[in-house]
């Protein structure tokens, strides 16, 4: 059985993951619907409850989605002072695979968790020293 302390810790993890997600969502200028699709939240009404801290804890899959989005943002802003680069990178159409002319944001919205994993991996590879 879960101990209350570990339940509190899990709730804290979920809360900080959400805080980070909403900060990134604001930086990327995502609509409520886009935020729902990225985190797999059923509706903007439920999303608003998450924003207000009134919704249930994130599921493991939702936590993974939030963590991947945080990793993507971190990869894009690792060089100090390039906050705008993240916005531009996420929104600009890219010819290279796997995007094939779509923006990374569109790719992630359309293809869900596998796409989030792929984009996070791609950015880690790009940032490795050659």
Task: Pin down the residues of each PLM region.
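Non-transmembrane "mature" sequence context
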Residues: 1-130
């Amino acid at each position: 059985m879960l101990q209350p302390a570990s339940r509190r810790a899990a709730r804290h993890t979920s809360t900080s993951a959400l805080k980070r997600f909403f900060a990134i969502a604001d930086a990327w200028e995502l609509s409520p619907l886009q935020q729902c699709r990225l985190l797999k939240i059923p509706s903007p009404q439920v999303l608003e409850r998450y924003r207000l801290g009134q919704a249930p804890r994130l599921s493991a899959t939702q936590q993974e989605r939030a963590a991947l989005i945080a990793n993507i943002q971190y990869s894009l802003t690792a060089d100090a002072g390039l906050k705008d680069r993240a916005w531009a990178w996420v929104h600009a159409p890219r010819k290279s695979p796997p995007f094939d002319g779509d923006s990374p944001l569109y790719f992630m919205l359309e293809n869900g968790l596998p796409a989030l994993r792929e984009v996070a991996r791609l950015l880690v590879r790009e940032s490795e020293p050659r």
